[in-house]
Amino acid sequence: MNRRTFHRAPEGERRQDLIEATLDTIAELGLQGATVRQIAIRAGVTAGLMRHYFASKDQMVAEAYRAMLANFAARAGDVAGEPGPRLRQFIVLNLTAPVANDRSLSLWASFISQVRVDSELAAIHREGYLAFRNDLQALIRDFLVAEGRPADEAECRRHAIAINGIIDGLWLEGCLAGELFEEAELASIALSAIEALLGLSLGSH
């Protein structure tokens, strides 16, 4: 287990350091193994200091899940340029490292098993899903408008749901068996499928 160097910093930064230590511990040991003691060891602090920032392990886990979802996927703000290249780059970023890697898979597997039984995690999951889907829907709308195609919100929403499903499925394949695919192969497959869905080219890939 690699320990973090916990340094003097503003309250918000120290809290973020502890959240990252929580995620590292969950990725390695799972939710059950990520005790307050193990997280404190990872962070290089005392369990008492952990309790200064978080009232309980449940609160730590909830904040860690919220942070994971915020950084788990690329967001629309991470890409710039014209609508077509923006949408294409958004898709590629969400199917390549660091979004698609072993750590992401470990965290996803640990948290997703609890989403169905923990109402707070379920609410955080819904919030993260909708933020990602809304980003995707906006990128699709901008692309369709730029191409002179109808961009009805209901249709853009349907496209976003479908494309999110394509990304999720290929992301999982890449994380579980990345060695079976050539570099950028899954991103290329996703782009081809999405072009077929939209009936438009997203450019070279």
Language model features with spans:
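Short, basic, alpha-helical segments at the C-terminal edge of helix-turn-helix-like DNA-binding modules
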Residues: 66-71
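Hydrophobic alpha-helical connector segments
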Residues: 63, 74-104, 156-163, 205
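Amphipathic alpha-helical packing segments from all-alpha helical-bundle domains
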Residues: 73, 77-78, 100-109, 119-146, ...
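Helix-turn-helix
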Residues: 17, 21-59, 63
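Short helix-capping/turn signature of helix-turn-helix
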Residues: 54, 96, 110-117
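Hydrophobic/aromatic-rich alpha-helical bundle segments in the mid-to-C-terminal region
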Residues: 120-126, 146-205
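N-terminal intrinsically disordered/low-complexity leader segments
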Residues: 1-13, 201-205
